[in-house]
Amino acid sequence: YERKHIGILEQVRRYVHLPVIVKLGMNLTNPVALINQLYANGAAAVVMFNRPYRPDIQIENVHFHAGEMWTRPSDICDALRWVGICSARIPNLGYAVSGGVHDGWAVVKSLLAGASAVEVCTTLFWNGPHRIEVMKEQMMQWMEEHGYDNIPKEWKTFLSGKQNDDVVFIKNLMQIATLLIKAAHQKFKK
C-alpha cells in the first residue's frame, strides 16, 4: 500500500514540472520511512492527514449512509504528533496540518509542531470565509503576547525534537499506553 505512494509520485513528477505535495492518509505503518522515501523521490511537501469518507449504518432502514463528515478541534492531535516527529527527522521537506484546524491557536500549534502550512475546511463551512480573519487575529494575539513580530524560522523546529525532548516523551508515552492496553487485554482474557 505505502509503495503505491512512491509510484504515483514518480508518475506525477514525470508529467508535471511543479512542486508536488502528497496528502497522506492516517493509517500508515511507518510514516517516517514513507515520508523519507517521498522526499528522496522529489516530493516538495506532505499534508498530514487526509480524512477519508467515513460511512455509517442506518440501523432503522439497514443501509449505509454518510457518517460524520466534519472535523472537531481534537482531530488535530495525530497530525501535530506526526508533523513534530517527521519534521525532526526529515527537516528539509514542507509539512501541512489538515483536520481539526478550527482557530488561530490551532494554526500556532501546527507551526510550533513543524508545519509551514495548514488546511482549513470545516470551520469555513460553519463560520464562513470571514473565519480566516478571526483565525489570523487569534494567531497575531498569541504572537504579540509571546513577543513575536513575525513567524520565525525557529518555529519549524521549536517542538520538533531538535530543541527539546517532547518527541521522546510522546514516543515513551505511546509505548507505555500500548503496554497498559496489552496488560489490560491479557487480564480480561483470563
Could you tell me what each predicted segment is?
Residues 1-3, 34-92, 127:
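Glycine/Thr-rich beta-alpha phosphate-binding loop at enzyme active sites
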Residues 5-10, 32-36, 80-84, 107, ...:
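Generic structural signal for well-ordered alpha-helices
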Residues 20-24, 46-48, 94-99, 118-120, ...:
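Hydrophobic faces of well-ordered beta-strands that scaffold small-molecule active sites
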Residues 28-41, 84-95, 101-118:
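Catalytic cores of alpha/beta
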Residues 45-55, 100-101, 106-134:
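Glycine-rich phosphate-binding active-site loops on the catalytic face of alpha/beta enzymes
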